[in-house]
Swiss-Prot record:
Region annotation Disordered: where it falls in the sequence: 255-290
Catalytic residues identified in the record: D67
InterPro entries in the cross-refs: PsdUridine_synth_cat_dom_sf, PsdUridine_synth_RsuA/RluA, RluA_PseudoU_synthase
PANTHER family associated with the record: MITOCHONDRIAL RNA PSEUDOURIDINE SYNTHASE, RNA PSEUDOURIDYLATE SYNTHASE DOMAIN-CONTAINING PROTEIN 1
Native organism taxonomy: Eukaryota, Metazoa, Chordata, Craniata, Vertebrata
Pfam families reported for this sequence: PseudoU_synth_2
Protein family according to the UniProt entry: Belongs to the pseudouridine synthase RluA family.
Gene3D superfamilies linked to this entry: Pseudouridine synthase (3.30.2350.10)
Molecular-function GO terms, alphabetical: pseudouridine synthase activity; RNA binding
Protein name, as recorded: RNA pseudouridylate synthase domain-containing protein 1
Record carries keyword Mitochondrion: no
Keyword GTP-binding listed: no
Organism in which the protein naturally occurs: Mus musculus
Length: 306
């Protein structure tokens, strides 16, 4: 796979209020460091200089975040009103996301609901990472839910691997990476939460991709599905052998699923057979949260959420 460049910006959804880009792997969203010669913000400014907003720190309002190593769907609001409508959807947990990943080992169950609370790791040398509740040094763990559905079993560079669809039902920092690791099936190429690998054997990227995104704002339903990057034709190291569930069927279920009710506490799982906790009515927005929203509308922070 080719590394990112200023020219290879892929747009998968565009309207007068929003863009959804297919972010390249190993690409930062934005940065104040002069050494970062290529960021998504710089790509956008290069391709859409007329859409840059001089009132923001980076010129564009990113509605959510992806890790440096994660590729896939990322939504950009093109004005303050659009950013506010997207913020409301995220606040009310009405956004639907689905990711593709290659994970180590053959996951035996076709569907798993991962329910581990996640907190910040306070252990010396690991303070930039997250961990599950019960881990030494885990601070302020919060309830976290991820639905995992197995698509294929196969080999990656000769090692057993499963291709999975991940649907986060909550939105904690590094949630998918932490949950897969806690399940005993770390994401291939995840050097932070995965298995220690020899330098020569490391894959060219972390195998996590934001595949599907839906943000049901009041004015429009922002919906985008990005190309699947984990195909043998694109990566000869990946050799699937068994199909467990067809991806097309699961994505069709996502597309036809009704938008989550803002009072239900979040999106529903892909399969109605798996019961999920249903939190009560969300509490009113506090003054601190309101101030945070206003700051969010004017500029962007750098902390990743996957």
């Amino acid at each position: 796979m080719e590394p990112g460049s200023m020219e290879n910006l892929s747009i998968v959804y565009q309207s007068s209020d929003f863009l959804v880009v297919n972010k390249h792997w190993d690409l930062r969203i934005d940065s104040k460091t002069w050494r970062e010669t290529l960021t998504l913000q710089k790509q956008l400014r290069h391709h859409f200089p007329e859409l840059a907003d001089p009132d923001t720190c980076y010129g564009f309002r990113f509605c959510h975040q992806l890790d440096f190593s994660t590729s896939g769907a990322l939504c950009v609001a093109l004005n303050k009103a659009a950013a506010g409508s997207a913020y409301k959807c995220f606040k009310e947990r009405r956004v639907t996301k689905a990711y593709l990943a290659l994970v180590r080992g053959h996951v035996q169950e076709s569907q798993v609901t991962i329910n581990y609370a996640i907190g910040r790791n306070s252990t010396e040398g690991r303070t930039h990472t997250m961990c599950i509740e019960g881990t030494h040094g885990c601070e302020n763990p919060k309830p976290s839910l991820t639905e995992l559905l197995v698509l294929e079993h196969g080999l990656y560079a000769g090692d057993p691997v499963s291709k999975v669809l991940l649907k986060p039902l909550t939105g904690r920092t590094h949630q998918l990476r932490v949950h897969c690791s806690a399940l005993g099936h770390p994401i291939v190429g995840d050097l932070t939460y995965g298995q220690a690998e020899d330098q020569e054997d490391q894959p060219f990227r972390m195998m996590l991709h934001a595949f599907y995104l839906r943000i049901p704002t009041q004015a429009e339903r922002v919906e985008a599905c990005t190309p699947d990057p984990f195909l043998p034709a694109l990566d000869a190291c990946w050799s699937p052998s068994t199909c467990v569930q067809p991806l097309e069927q699961l994505i069709q279920a996502l597309r036809t699923d009704p938008d989550p009710d803002p009072m239900s506490g979040g999106p529903r799982p892909c399969s109605p057979s798996t019961p999920q906790p249903r939190p009560g009515r969300p509490p009113p927005e506090t003054e601190a949260q309101r101030a945070s929203c206003l700051q969010w509308l004017s500029e962007w922070t750098l902390e990743p959420d996957n």
